[in-house]
Amino acid sequence: MPELPEVETAKNGITPYLDGFYIEKIIVRQPKLRWEVSPELSQISHQKVTALSRRAKYLIIHTAQGYIIGHLGMSGAVRIVSPDSPVNKHDHLDIVMNNGKIMRYNDPRRFGAWFWTENLDEFPLFAKLGPEPLSGEFNSDYLFKKSRKKPTAVKSFIMNNAVVVGIGNIYANEVLFQCGLHPEKPAGKITKTQAALLTETIKKELTRAIAQGGTTLKDFLQPDGKPGYFVQELQIYGKKGCPCPKCGQKIESFTVGQRNSYVCLHCQKK
C-alpha cells in the first residue's frame, strides 16, 4: 500500500503539470472503487487548479470551486501521460488538463477512492486524523503523553491514524528497528527518551524516503514511471531469515495487529 512518502512523491510529481492549469474534463471509466467515485467529478469543466497538497495518505487537488481528493488504496498510482497514450487495463480515471497533459489513475485492485468536496474542513474522512508526522505538532512530548496507559503494541500505536498519520507497515518496521524497539512492546511503557528517539526517527525515515521517491515493492511507481528507490535502503522489512545489519542474528517475522512484522530479537527488546 502506498504510504505517506509514496503519496507525497505522487503529489510532487504531478504538481508541475496541474498547478496553475485548467481541468478540461475528468473521465471516469470505473466508478466502483473502494467507495464510489463522486459523481460531481464527471461534471467538472474548465476549473483552475490552484494548489496541490496532501493530508495523511490522501492527495488533494485544490480548484477554484472545491477539492478533488484521491486515495491510492492498495495498488493505485498516478502518472502523467499525453492524450495519445493508450488506455490500459485498470486505468480508471483521467484528469484532462488544458496543457496537453493527462493525470491518469491506475488501480489493479480497485481499493482506491476519488472524492469531491466543497469544504475541506468538513470532509468526514479527515475528522479523526492525527497530526502530520513531519509537522511541529508531532513531537516527543505529544507522543509520550499520547502513549500513556496504552497497552497497545507500539507498532500498532504508531500506525494508528488517530495518533499520527501516514505511517504504514513498511516504515513502522524500519523505524522500530532503528530505535531498537520490539514491535510488541506496550506503547504505555516507552520512556520519554524512547518517545524522543521514536519521533526523531519517524521524521528522519519519512524524509529520507520522500527524497528517494518512496518505496516500490510491487505496484507503486512515481508519476514519471520510475520506481521508488528507498526499497534499496530497507534494513529489515521483508528480510525474514536474513542477517541483521547491526548484529548478524537472523531476522524473525511474525504478525502484530494482523500485519507482518520483522524483528531482530537481539537488537529490539520488549
Swiss-Prot record:
Keywords: DNA damage, DNA repair, DNA-binding, Glycosidase, Hydrolase, Lyase, Metal-binding, Multifunctional enzyme, Zinc, Zinc-finger. Coiled coil: none annotated. Disulfide bonds: none annotated. InterPro entries: DNA_glyclase/AP_lyase_DNA-bd, Formamido-pyr_DNA_Glyclase, FPG_cat, MutM-like_N-ter, Ribosomal_uS13-like_H2TH, Znf_DNA_glyclase/AP_lyase, Znf_FPG/IleRS. A zinc finger (FPG-type) spans 235-269. Binds 1 zinc ion per subunit. The keyword DNA-binding applies. Its EC number is 3.2.2.23, 4.2.99.18. One of its GO terms (molecular function) is class I DNA-(apurinic or apyrimidinic site) endonuclease activity. It catalyses: Hydrolysis of DNA containing ring-opened 7-methylguanine residues, releasing 2,6-diamino-4-hydroxy-5-(N-methyl)formamidopyrimidine; 2'-deoxyribonucleotide-(2'-deoxyribose 5'-phosphate)-2'-deoxyribonucleotide-DNA = a 3'-end 2'-deoxyribonucleotide-(2,3-dehydro-2,3-deoxyribose 5'-phosphate)-DNA + a 5'-end 5'-phospho-2'-deoxyribonucleoside-DNA + H(+). The keyword DNA damage applies. Gene3D superfamilies: 1.10.8.50, MutM-like, N-terminal. Its cofactor is Zn(2+). DNA binds at H90, R109, K150. Transmembrane segments: none annotated. GO terms for biological process: base-excision repair. The active site is at P2 (schiff-base intermediate with dna), E3 (proton donor), K57 (proton donor), R259 (proton donor). Belongs to the FPG family. Involved in base excision repair of DNA damaged by oxidation or by mutagenic agents. Acts as a DNA glycosylase that recognizes and removes damaged bases. Has a preference for oxidized purines, such as 7,8-dihydro-8-oxoguanine (8-oxoG). Has AP (apurinic/apyrimidinic) lyase activity and introduces nicks in the DNA strand. Cleaves the DNA backbone by beta-delta elimination to generate a single-strand break at the site of the removed base with both 3'- and 5'-phosphates. Monomer. This is Formamidopyrimidine-DNA glycosylase. It comes from Actinobacillus succinogenes (strain ATCC 55618 / DSM 22257 / CCUG 43843 / 130Z). The lineage of its organism: Bacteria, Pseudomonadati, Pseudomonadota, Gammaproteobacteria, Pasteurellales.
